[in-house]
A protein has these predicted regions:
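Short, basic/aromatic recognition patches
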Residues: 2-24
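Charged, gly/pro-rich active-site loop segments
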Residues: 2-8, 81-144
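Short, solvent-exposed aromatic-acidic interface loops
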Residues: 54-58, 109
Length: 144
């Protein structure tokens, strides 16, 4: 079953998947026009899908040039259930709040704080505003 919405509010399944211990495949556009996709930790904050990266990383530089982003969050317990969010990064947050946020995500995924020696540049929270969300659940029976 597939369900699509163009609403800027998070679909309940998107929020559920982003709040859980599920990984996101995140796609941004390189300056050459090619796509770059990587796996990231994901969360929900202020009604938005949020990611956390560092300012020296290619992904962040891509988003500075072009804020469009696709975030696909797969249910770790059921790979045939996922949410795709196409949207834009509409807010970024740096400083102590971003540093604490990466610790929150790290505790969610690993059980401990993010290692300080792994940080090479300033942390930044990326808030994604959806323009289109597609929810896929291939196990859901749509016949009544």
């Amino acid at each position: 079953m597939a369900e699509t919405t163009n609403a800027p509010e998070l679909h309940p399944v998107t929020e559920e998947l982003a709040s859980g211990k599920n990984f996101a495949s995140v796609t941004t556009m390189l300056p050459s026009g090619q796509f770059q996709t990587g796996v990231m930790w994901v969360g929900v904050r202020n009604g938005s899908v949020v990611l956390n990266t560092e300012t020296h990383r290619r992904r962040y530089k891509n988003l500075e040039s072009d804020p469009r982003i696709t975030v696909m969050i797969r249910d770790e317990n059921d790979p045939y259930r996922y949410a795709e969010v196409r949207g834009e990064v509409t807010r970024t947050t740096t400083g102590p709040e971003a540093r604490e946020h990466i610790d929150e995500l790290s505790r969610k995924y690993t059980g401990s704080d993010y290692p300080p020696d792994a940080i090479k540049s300033e942390r930044v929270i990326l808030e994604v505003t959806p323009r289109r969300q597609t929810i896929i659940d291939q196990n859901k029976d749509t016949s009544d």
